């Protein structure tokens, strides 16, 4: 949005300098991108009157002019402009004057006393282009008759005016006009707002144009009037041309300029039809497939049912709310016109211009929303200017209202506004802010019920009103309050270690940390978690990142594949991250979302050689027991049980459930062969995933006395059915340690396993196996006697025999 400061100050004139006004607008959300002078610097250029014009004696295209420039003496100036004539007033550059450089960055053009074809010239008569006021170089810049002779041209044309360029956010459609900016300025500064003086024009004709609105979802209100006898060749007043140019709009013709002027002034695009080119009445409707329209810009567009049009009895005449058609365009020969101003529903205009690869000021405004209550007033304003400039006789305004927005009140709680803004704003001050913004409201204690005005399409929810309060209150008045945290010593729980310590421990065991998205491919969830109903994202950033993960296995395999594709041979990675599981038992809290558990887990993956290639170690592929050893070291001193179980992502015979104190805390094992084949992995990676809490918790270290007496070691071999797991025997022996007979048992370790191929002299059947355990016993108070040791060993054997049918091997 671009406009001159002088135009703005005709509506509101706060006691602020240009820079202060710019800062105030920016801090209220109307970002001023640039301030620039209306014209480049000039010196010694004044208003002069041409007194006499005679032909140059030695040049056909030059004239010798006598000029009164208010200096007390008549100046002789040689001029080649085709429109020079006695009596006109023009800008005169005196000797010593400086004009803007011909090219940007060049030196100013200095005027000197010179001779042109032997005739002395005491200055220069200037065109608008030479002053860098416009691109018009067809002749001299003719000034209004009432401009004082001798006045500095900068004062005469207000060239020290400042042009504001404001970057508006899409929701601020109410500021796409000078009056809209003025309305905001008045609210921000408290300066009085002078509304435009719009008076109804007396109708001298009774004629109206038949109008039918067939699409109320396209057009909610349509106002128009007939004006006859206009002079389309009338010259646009200099003040209007000046304002349009400083708003970035070139002058076209009086009728077009007036329509554009009111759009920049009040924010409503309008359209002027050549009445004599309209066939019958007009119909506001949706387009039809197969129809086409040649637009004012020369393009011909193909229409369909998604585009609104204005048609007459013969053809389509305009692209509704976007651009008029060429067939009814006004020309310099136009004498009768039909003036239209309407309310177009934003949804019916949005995106239609872009569909045809162009944009217009009208579409830019209508797709954001334009005041639907002022169509008649704007028709009256345009009519007033047309009659003043072009003459003519106006008919009555035909105003058809079929479907206007029903704006529901929006409630705002003052307490919530204060909490969000971060400062206590008095309720009376909030009421004053709403009054300054022109927002009608009802107040009920802490609650303000605001009815959005017709020009504010951006007020729909409570947060919109809170934004308005913050803007007008002033962001600069909101104090900067950095978060304050009390500095105090906090006790460290010695029974817990941080996740950072776990990261360091894994890094020390040659694992590299990786960080992955918490959202993954739905196929990963099926493959690695057996989950067909994951937590889905409402707005995923990519189709392959559409669900929240419930396991880290998929992310780790994804990292493995990424590295293998880059010719890595040995990969050891881990991740400490959260998974997301639907759980109705979870209640909402500061760090919790109702219905969803978000536990933190530690996952790791090892692939390839167990060690880097070297001369001192044999190369082999990493296996289950390598990774199990890493996990046991990570858990120490906690001892976990590894229970044979099946997981959808793990090898059926090489995977286990991890249990700590009887509670399942994770999984470990080789990747399932099916997934190896699917993800094209040459070897099986070994992975584990475990709850972070199981690794964080640790027992408080307790000192124990080192015995001065030697330990006793006994080996026992028991025969059991091959289906009996070693872990089950360990569990039974661990239970026996609670008995008094086994109180001196320090350690039990398996050191041998034997399986008979058939019934042999070993005394074992083919379905049995022999397990050899080494039992270490020690007493801190004295040397153990054989009787005590024998009793402990017998207790262990009896327990295994009672539960699993174990017998000592003979």
Curated annotation (Swiss-Prot):
Domain spans labelled tRNA-binding: 39-154
UniProt catalytic activity: tRNA(Phe) + L-phenylalanine + ATP = L-phenylalanyl-tRNA(Phe) + AMP + diphosphate + H(+)
Necessary cofactors: Mg(2+)
Protein name per Swiss-Prot or TrEMBL: Phenylalanine--tRNA ligase beta subunit
Protein EC: 6.1.1.20
Lineage: Bacteria, Pseudomonadati, Pseudomonadota, Betaproteobacteria, Burkholderiales
GO BP field: phenylalanyl-tRNA aminoacylation
Record localization: Cytoplasm
Record: residues binding Mg(2+): 458, 464, 467-468
Domain FDX-ACB: 707-809
NCBIfam families: pheT_bact, YtpR
Assembly with partners or alone: Tetramer of two alpha and two beta subunits.
């Amino acid at each position: 949005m671009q406009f001159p400061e002088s135009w703005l100050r005709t509506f509101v004139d706060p006691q602020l300098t240009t820079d202060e006004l710019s800062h105030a607008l920016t801090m209220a959300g109307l970002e001023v991108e640039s301030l620039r002078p209306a014209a480049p610097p000039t010196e010694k250029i004044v208003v002069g009157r041409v007194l006499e014009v005679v032909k140059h004696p030695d040049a056909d295209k030059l004239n010798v002019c006598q000029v009164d420039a208010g200096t007390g003496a008549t100046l002789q100036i040689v001029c080649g402009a085709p429109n020079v004539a006695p009596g006109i007033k023009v800008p005169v550059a005196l000797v010593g004057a400086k004009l803007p450089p011909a090219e940007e960055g060049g030196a100013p053009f200095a005027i000197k006393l010179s001779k042109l074809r032997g005739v002395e010239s005491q200055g220069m008569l200037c065109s608008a282009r030479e002053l860098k006021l416009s691109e018009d170089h067809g002749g001299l810049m003719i000034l209004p008759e009432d401009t004082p002779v001798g006045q500095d041209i900068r004062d005469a044309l207000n060239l020290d005016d400042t042009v504001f360029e404001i970057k508006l956010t899409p929701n601020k459609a109410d500021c796409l006009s000078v009056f809209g900016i003025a309305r905001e300025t008045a609210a921000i500064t408290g300066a009085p707002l002078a509304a435009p003086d719009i008076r109804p024009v007396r109708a001298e004709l009774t004629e109206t144009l038949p109008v039918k609105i067939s699409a109320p979802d396209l057009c909610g209100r349509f106002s128009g009037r007939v004006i006859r006898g206009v002079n389309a060749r009338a010259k646009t007043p200099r003040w209007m041309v000046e304002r349009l140019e400083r708003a970035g709009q070139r002058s076209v013709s009086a009728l077009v300029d007036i329509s554009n002027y009111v759009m920049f002034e009040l924010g409503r695009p309008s359209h002027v039809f050549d009445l004599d080119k309209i066939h019958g009445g007009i119909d506001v409707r949706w387009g039809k497939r197969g129809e086409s329209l040649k637009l004012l810009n020369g393009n011909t567009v193909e229409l369909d049912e998604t585009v609104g049009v204005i048609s007459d009895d013969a053809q389509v005449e305009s692209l509704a709310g976007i651009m008029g058609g060429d067939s009814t365009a006004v020309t310099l020969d136009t004498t009768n016109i039909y003036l239209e101003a309407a309310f177009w529903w934003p949804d019916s205009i949005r995106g239609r211009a872009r569909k045809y690869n162009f944009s217009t000021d009208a579409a830019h405004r209508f797709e954001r929303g334009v005041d639907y209550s002022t169509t008649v007033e704007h028709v009256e304003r345009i009519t007033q200017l047309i009659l003043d400039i072009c003459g003519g006789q106006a008919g009555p305004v035909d105003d058809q209202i079929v479907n206007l927005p029903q704006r529901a009140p929006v409630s705002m709680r003052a307490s919530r506004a204060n909490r969000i803004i971060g400062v206590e704003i008095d309720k009376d001050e909030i009421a004053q802010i709403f009054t300054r913004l022109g927002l009608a409201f009802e107040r009920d204690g802490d609650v303000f019920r605001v009815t959005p005005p017709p020009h504010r399409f951006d007020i729909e929810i409570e947060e919109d009103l809170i934004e308005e309060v913050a803007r007008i209150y002033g962001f600069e008045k909101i104090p900067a309050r950095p978060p304050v945290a009390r500095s105090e010593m906090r006790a460290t729980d010695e029974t817990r270690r941080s996740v950072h310590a776990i990261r360091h421990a894994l890094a020390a065991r040659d694992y590299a940390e990786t960080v992955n998205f918490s959202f993954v491919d739905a196929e990963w969830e099926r493959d690695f978690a057996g989950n067909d109903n994951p937590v889905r994202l409402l707005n995923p950033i990519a189709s392959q990142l559409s669900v929240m993960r419930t396991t880290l296995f998929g992310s780790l395999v994804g990292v493995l594949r990424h590295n293998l594709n880059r010719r890595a041979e040995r990969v050891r990675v881990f991740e400490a991250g959260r998974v997301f599981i639907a759980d109705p038992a979870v209640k909402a809290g500061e760090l919790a979302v109702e219905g969803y558990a978000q536990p933190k887990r530690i996952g790791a993956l090892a692939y390839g050689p167990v060690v880097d290639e070297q001369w001192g170690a044999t190369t082999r592929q990493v296996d289950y027991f390598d990774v199990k050893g890493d996990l046991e070291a990570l858990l120490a001193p906690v001892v976990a049980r590894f229970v044979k179980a099946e997981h959808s992502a793990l090898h059926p015979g090489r995977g286990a459930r991890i249990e700590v104190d009887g509670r399942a805390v994770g999984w470990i094992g080789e990747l399932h062969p099916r997934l190896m084949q699917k993800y094209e992995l040459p070897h099986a990676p070994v992975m584990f995933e475990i709850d972070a809490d199981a690794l964080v918790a640790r027992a408080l270290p307790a000192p124990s006395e080192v015995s001065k007496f030697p330990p006793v070691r006994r080996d026992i071999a028991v025969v059991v059915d091959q289906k009996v797991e070693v872990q089950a025997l360990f569990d039974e022996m661990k239970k026996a340690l609670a008995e008094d007979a086994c109180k001196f048992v320090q350690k039990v370790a398996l050191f041998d396993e034997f399986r008979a191929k058939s019934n042999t002299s070993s005394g074992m059947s083919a379905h049995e196996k022999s397990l050899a355990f080494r039992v270490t016993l020690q007493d801190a108070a004295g040397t153990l006697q054989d009787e005590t040791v024998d009793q402990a060993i017998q207790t262990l054997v009896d327990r295994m025999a009672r539960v699993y049918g174990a017998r000592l091997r003979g």
